[in-house]
């Protein structure tokens, strides 16, 4: 019966009845190449190079070949394989023909028009129709060849399926074959196609090419790939896509390879296999780094290439083509080479040689290797160390250890402190005689899904013998299907199975390993993969699963289990922006046959250690024992083993025993751990830090060079490069030695090094930028490129998915969407012409029928006549979530993971429908909602985000039900206990009814879904579904004769789907709202007939683009918005996306969370209160879990949280069930984000409020970052959040389900529960796991309600945060939050910083540091001993790296105002802008200086506090109370106990004293069950801005002002004015207290005191904020706008205040908007116009102040910019007389010009101030008048009294006390950076005492090296340290002695020297200050620090400066005196002792 008779039309309705049993359409055969090509059987039959092994005959193939030979002409030449036809059929063709791009151009116009309306600003909008037309051109021969091959393949399919002649494809029968004659590339070919064999005859040449059907598919595949490459290359090149190859380069590469194959045949692939290496070599050569040898890799490749070429048939020709490839690569840019690297499959694949592949495995795998036993010891010791260290870091304790540890390790275990490899006592041998005990136990309910897979397996021994005896060879048919074997056997108890293997091993019956050739490899010698027997496969799968789940998390270097986003983050951290200019060396290791070379010797101890961790004796350790005992054989089906005496004989290499190595993929994770251990060992031995990323044999090492150490040695750049070269070469050499020693040889020739190129897998990063590699996915993006049922939706989905993945490696993913459209249009064109699955075409203008569910039945629908262009457009545009196909909208190409696809779909349709187009009506119809008549509850529960559309029946649903019915009832599988049980179990589980009973009127489908998942029935049903969806089961079912039609039904469903799409586009539903978000929200409610909560999420396309203010736009909106700043040369850390973090705290047992079968129920149980789950639903969850587990065995399974304080966050944002994406992430190259700074600080109502809103911040950032980065206009963007329907408060409340509903009650009947327990197992005892920690809840007095205790709660929160931050600073571990970007301050959530005081944080952190260190040194943190404690603290904290302060820094981003002369010192403003490193340095300096000031710590602590217990342990609480007992009660007992046992070990009982100090504190320090996040909700946002100080008595200005004569004429003199004038002699800068960060405060205060009021003041060049601070105080009623050049673009992500100048950012009348809105550089072309736009919007009087530093042309730029402003704008600019006199004529249009001078300015540089008003016209300064004015101003300044000027300094300092305080703080910070941390008290001492203290400080902290010294030793005086300490001493001497000429002359001659033996006496004096004969130019900072110290001492403390000579130690002057203090030694008057003991 034909298909046509079963369809009423092209999309006909389903008319199958009972009589149709047994009839069906034939299954569509493969049209996708999915296996390796091996033609050994052809060679054997045709006697052409026949294989050397015994071949099993294939009778069907033989018959076809025999008939083919009979049809052939005599004398014709035969060749096996089609590869040599590439050059003939795909020659270089100058003729290009257009591909149909009508659909693409139409859609692009829609996107272009809509995107312009939306102000989307992406590159896609700039691609015109003409560009697409021009780009959519392909070589004509490729298109013609592809169509020919396609027709032949279609014809063969039609011939086989209809068992007749494929007439429509012009083919005719020819015996067992069909035939077609074609002309391809002007050559005639005869195609003779059979079911197995294909022959292509070149008519004129009398050549015959014979191969299998796969070889024909290869021809199609190569043609298809090349069409994809050409289309995307040409369009990409025209549209400027990075990585787009020119047509010339693409064709040159393809043609060179084709020619090589044509001349040398299959052997050419050996040379082409080097193509990727040539690309990498070219990249390395293009990018030398001066450290590594950038030519070495290419040279090594050249050697190998020459060997391969020499062995080829035509060496000279091969060399010429290889040279052509190399020459082509040389001409290409880096990004083009990277993309061309992905073309390695464009030449197809060779015919593989099975024998050679087996020979390689046998040769390497049986080679006996002598491996030194010590290497195995090293490996296992390193494994133990790494496992224990990471375990301790996570759990704060060690796993169980047995044996005898070494001395240092024993101490670490005893004291429970972290192992530090830098500790002097550390020794790896400490781990040699210990064993890690059982840490994890195998779950009783081990997940069955681990072993269920439809992959092939090897038959067992008896089955293989039987198959060979029966003449079936090694194929064994159904015995090879793993799924079928499992079903026909019995189900497996995983734990029992593993225990049995542990005891007995595998039986001989199971010891077989079949080898088969891997597909799609460019290797002639086949790459062999392994087929294990069923039980062997279970063994490896289960043990590898254990390693993956429990071992790998302790090795973060291994990336095997990392998700895509984690992998991206790791790659970006290793090779991203921070690697630019780095000397760190990337080493790309290439192991030689990594798996096969693995041997038992070095790994056995490590594997036994893994066994011990799981409580086994010899499980994983049996790996090599199994390999060695197994029969290894070729399982391709072509080899026939020999049997003798019932035993298979060895026939190496095709069949052998005694394999000593490993096999690919069989112990991958275990061997990866072993490899990582050896690499880590090498790193430690070489004392070099290493960043490692690895999986299997792909190991990438980044050696971190000790550059800071080299800096300390003052090495030059060249010397550093030399050291880096030596270190990296040494590392590679030692790596080669050690891996060769363990039998894993490294291909040193193919291992390459580079500091610039980073490559992991196939992903490349060069100089911190990800290189494009989109060809890899592009080549697989056409209709026949992937396996599976060939459907329209599947084709579109495949192409969309591939091109979306291509976008992830591109800087322009939106253009990848254009490629998707074009490639989809091409595929749809030939699919519409003839659909190979349905066997019919889709005719334009035809009508179609299909049926819909309506009113409980089916209704037939007739469509209008089709327009195929519009139908194709709908198929590619409309996503499935809104009723379309499996496509991906443009938005999905830009970011991944947006959860609500319906909301995204409606936003996309609204976007497309916003512009006029031929399909606008269709798109608007799809935007409407057509509800389904029925509510399918199971669809809602199982697909929580879905909409209930009116759609045709789900394709294949009835077929699946039929398969399941047969599967569960057929006797064939009844011996399988699981299958047998399922028939009964699922009969009692009515899925639809159960789901219906889970629905409520107001519901959250995600919760219902999770509750549904807790049913044991659902887990079992999932296994059944997994089984029934396998290819094996589908094939078995299709082979039944007693079934209903399946294929024909699917064919009808396919056509019905197409018909529905056209009908739906013509049918209008209901528009609920114009807002897409609300349309989705209401669509859900209407469709499901209930209120759906917690699902609908606004998409950025809908929310962010309704009101966009771009650079230059006038923004007058006051509503919330996201601020973004685009800087073309930006270096901002990119936002990569973030993972959703659940914020529910739970004490639930760890074992309950890890049990796979109850983990869903366990998650719900610990979140009951947060979810707000009703009692009935809770009961159902617990009852469902109870069917698998007795929850009473756990100490805590359900969290009781009556106060609701154990969680924060809404369900919508934080609930992460399995059905939801783990987060939102970018889908483009990360460097795109460098140009964009984004912040939600201008979105306070959503980002800092107490209410949760339906706003997806991660999605907004991901989308905005891309949109803005590509907009092209520098400046700021405001994306206003306008729609009140989109972003609404989250509603999490939902209804409870009814109690005791019938279907649920039935499902939980005892008979079904019993089956679940029998099938899956039952947990009746608590699983053993050493991971579980004891309950650490603090002991104390708890309160439930914190109302009325807000102040105490604030104290407790701050104390707890500070305690944890202090521990982190001092090297303790703490679980930190995952960072959002690549460099951020997210140690604590950003919101915390807005609610706590920076002063409190720094004060309390300092207190805790002092306490902890006081305990360590045996002192009390009380005033009488504080000096010693402080010194120790300064020592320790000084040595902590910046990363140690990340947690405390994240708490200080609120930046409240510091207090003057406060004990808590806050260092602010020493650099602009505030980068992460600047912030960390300032926090570190603040803590150091606060330590130096602290005398009493009790002032920082509160006697009464309330602590949130769920964020602290009992240890935390106890230590904090212990500290309070000491400082408030002076309790010495507690302190003594802490000293005796250590802070970590002391207990409650031991801290009790007879004064009852602890009891008192326990009564006043309360606890509350609350998380830190919840506690923060109770704290208000701090007000951090202050009003500017308005002084009642403002001083009078001492500035001198003169008006400049002007003239009005068009042309002016351009002769310079002679500016030679006499300046006042005295420079008052030396008397200024404010030196840092700027002293401009003085001069601007003086100048502005004489200026009248303005409404708006713009201050240019004000990075420090000093000038704007002065202006804010001088004009308190004005708005001040600071502007500055961003000297660094590496800002703190999302932190607006890091852009604001630090000195003025907290003043209420300072507005930083111009900093955001305008380009940061006045010289940028757009600056002037943008400035004019903003200034024009200001109302009132306007003053522009310029404090920009610079001379020459910059003066002209400033003047011309200011004169460009609106008339009547006043300007006041700082300049220099030289610039003014040389360029005065530029001031055309300036009136009311005044010249101002101040005695407080830098007069020695001629610094003056010019003010003028912008008038326009020809007014300008008169040359002579300006010259006279200059003379008058200078005379006036000379007449200003010095006393008047110095008095003015004091008055200004009193106006700005914070600035004076800040200056001293920064000066002290500068001293700390030079190596000396001194308190103000010390700096205020008598001059001699201060010098003596500093001298003693240096001698107690530093020493000259006696011999060698190591990196990280901060006490050794290296050359750099010597320079810094010399600066320190010189600046202090300037501060003590003054800054007169004689002092400077003397100070500049001093340096540090070292005494070899020291001065004998009571103490050793080894570092001396010595005067040399050589003067050193003192640096500017030395003067500034000296002045700060001197003015602090003389003007604040009124100390006197020292007089007299400085002298020499022990010899003369001041140094003679201070050298004797504390050193009772004889002093020689001549100083002879010193002369004999000095070391320079």
From Swiss-Prot:
Q: Which PROSITE patterns match?
A: RDRP_SSRNA_NEG_NONSEG, SAM_MT_MNV_L
InterPro entries hit by this protein? L_poly_C, Mononeg_mRNAcap, Mononeg_RNA_pol_cat, Mononega_L_MeTrfase
- This protein's species is Lettuce big-vein associated virus (isolate Japan/Kagawa) (LBVaV)
Catalytic reaction(s) noted: RNA(n) + a ribonucleoside 5'-triphosphate = RNA(n+1) + diphosphate; a 5'-end (5'-triphosphoguanosine)-adenylyl-adenylyl-cytidylyl-adenosine in mRNA + 2 S-adenosyl-L-methionine = a 5'-end (N(7)-methyl 5'-triphosphoguanosine)-(2'-O-methyladenylyl)-adenylyl-cytidylyl-adenosine in mRNA + 2 S-adenosyl-L-homocysteine + H(+); a 5'-end (5'-triphosphoguanosine)-adenylyl-adenylyl-cytidylyl-adenosine in mRNA + S-adenosyl-L-methionine = a 5'-end (5'-triphosphoguanosine)-(2'-O-methyladenylyl)-adenylyl-cytidylyl-adenosine in mRNA + S-adenosyl-L-homocysteine + H(+); GTP + H2O = GDP + phosphate + H(+)
Q: Which domain of life is it from?
A: Viruses
Limits of the RdRp catalytic domain: 583-768
Grouped into one coarse class, the protein's main location is: virion
In the UniProt record, does the keyword Nuclease occur? no
- Which GO terms fall under molecular function for this chain's record? ATP binding; GTPase activity; mRNA 5'-cap (guanine-N7-)-methyltransferase activity; RNA-directed RNA polymerase activity
Role noted for this protein: Displays RNA-directed RNA polymerase, mRNA guanylyl transferase, mRNA (guanine-N(7)-)-methyltransferase and poly(A) synthetase activities. The viral mRNA guanylyl transferase displays a different biochemical reaction than the cellular enzyme. The template is composed of the viral RNA tightly encapsidated by the nucleoprotein (N). Functions either as transcriptase or as replicase. The transcriptase synthesizes subsequently subgenomic RNAs, assuring their capping and polyadenylation by a stuttering mechanism.
Full protein name: RNA-directed RNA polymerase L
What keywords are assigned to this protein? ATP-binding, Host cytoplasm, Hydrolase, Methyltransferase, mRNA capping, mRNA processing, Multifunctional enzyme, Nucleotide-binding, Nucleotidyltransferase, RNA-directed RNA polymerase, S-adenosyl-L-methionine, Transferase, Viral RNA replication, Virion
Where in or outside the cell it occurs: the entry states: Virion; Host cytoplasm
Q: What is its EC number?
A: 2.7.7.48, 3.6.1.-, 2.7.7.88, 2.1.1.375
The gene behind this protein is L
Q: Which Pfam families match?
A: Mononeg_mRNAcap, Mononeg_RNA_pol
GO cellular component terms, semicolon-separated: host cell cytoplasm; virion component
Q: Which family does it belong to?
A: Belongs to the varicosavirus protein L family.
Where do the Mononegavirus-type SAM-dependent 2'-O-MTase domain residues begin and end? 1632-1811
Q: Which NCBIfam families match?
A: paramyx_RNAcap
For whether the record's keyword set contains Protease, the answer is: no
